[in-house]
Amino acid sequence: CVKKKYDCRATLHIHYILVRGEYRSLGIASRLLNEMERSADAWLAQSECLRGRVFSFCEQNAPELMTSEEYFTDCLHARIDQCDRLAWWCKKGYNRLRFNYFQPSLSEDAKACTILTLNVKQASGTQVPALILQEHLRRFFYISVLKAHEDGTASRLVGWLGTQNRIEVEGRPAFYKRLQKSFYSSEAVTRRPLSLLFDEPNVTG
């Protein structure tokens, strides 16, 4: 149904691209990403029934939903500034989907993660059919995230997508540069959450 209506042959989900700190700025992440996309295309090309567009997804932190402590702690762990990382993904064609995304809890005693965005790379267009996103997250949540446990949050999000037609895609590197400046300002240190610094929570440049 999804394939026939939207010419979608597959969806992919990138969990991580990991590059050791001493090997950064050598283009390794770009090469790994290109190789992943090339390998996926080659695998899909083996089947005549898998013709059409590929939608690639990845989760990223949403800095505007983070406190200063969360932001800089993650920068320290990742050894890259959060906004620089988002601008990099944006330049690679991965832009955020405009809806309140969250990752369901990874275990029964954990909470859902609500400071994430879901980003997508597609061949063209500024919207993604909600049905494609619904089917992708249904598989991603129940295979990779929830595994052997169930919480109602995943069902609610997947169900909500079933009531939508399309989800808008947004994001520009300039937006992340403005966001980055806010984190390094004295005002941002004293006022949290950061989203309060913007008139519109999803400003794009």
What are the functions of these language-model segments?
Residues 1-21:
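A conserved beta-strand-loop-helix scaffold within acyl/acetyltransferase catalytic domains
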Residues 4-7, 38-52:
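Alpha-helix termini
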Residues 21-24, 63-65:
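A short acidic, glycine/proline-enriched capping/turn motif at secondary-structure boundaries
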Residues 18-23, 124-127:
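A generic structural motif
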Residues 19, 25-42:
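Conserved acetyl-CoA-binding loop-helix of GNAT-fold acetyltransferases
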Residues 9-12, 27-31, 35, 80-87:
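Short, well-structured alpha-helical interface segments that form or flank functional binding sites
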Residues 45-205:
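Terminal substrate-recognition subdomain of acyl/acetyltransferases
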